[in-house]
A protein has these predicted regions:
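Helix-start/capping segments and mature chain N-termini
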Residues: 1-173
Length: 173
């Protein structure tokens, strides 16, 4: 099965998406390596259904220790005090776009931290975004009904999106 190529509608980049924290993990290494992209993603499908029933666009998933991890389909980042944070990657697929964003931050002196962080730290973020092959860097408007930062104002996300677009343009020229 090959997924259809889809592009995030432009209005999503202006409005952002909503996330709902779910009680479903991405996967445990003893049952299914969460770092691998596999055909068996029942847990991610169930997480997405749970989030959509709660009125959200996607599910925010925690790791087995309760730290923020990933969404049901994309990697997750937050911005706090001018620093970009993402999970350790121990319980999520370490995507290509995720790594490109990490590399761009390092190359352009944007502080980037790959670390464990709590849901409460996430609620206090100035910005949050997802990374994925089709979504690039998609802003998050709210998590669990809590607005993240100032709606529609995402200076760090815009900076990273511009750097990412330039990288793609250079690589495909």
């Amino acid at each position: 099965i090959i997924m259809e190529h889809s592009k995030v509608p432009e209005h999503i980049y202006n409005k952002g998406i909503t996330l709902h924290t779910v009680p479903i993990y991405r996967g445990l290494p003893v049952t299914q390596d969460p770092k691998l992209n596999s055909h068996s993603k029942l847990n991610c499908i169930l997480a997405c259904i749970h989030a959509q029933k709660a009125g959200a666009d996607e599910a925010l998933m925690l790791d087995p220790q309760g730290f923020v991890n990933t969404t049901n389909s994309c990697n997750f980042f937050i911005v706090r005090r001018g620093e970009v944070w993402t999970s350790t990657g121990d319980y999520c697929m370490n995507g290509i776009t995720r790594q490109k964003v990490i590399d761009l931050c390092r190359a352009h002196q944007i502080p980037i931290h790959i670390r464990n962080f709590s849901l409460m730290e996430t609620y206090g973020a100035e910005e949050a975004f997802l990374t994925g092959t089709f979504g690039a860097q998609t802003p998050v408007d709210s998590i669990d009904g809590r607005t993240i930062g100032t709606p529609g104002q995402w200076p760090m996300i815009e900076k990273i999106r511009k750097l990412y677009k330039n990288l793609v343009r250079e690589d495909t020229a």
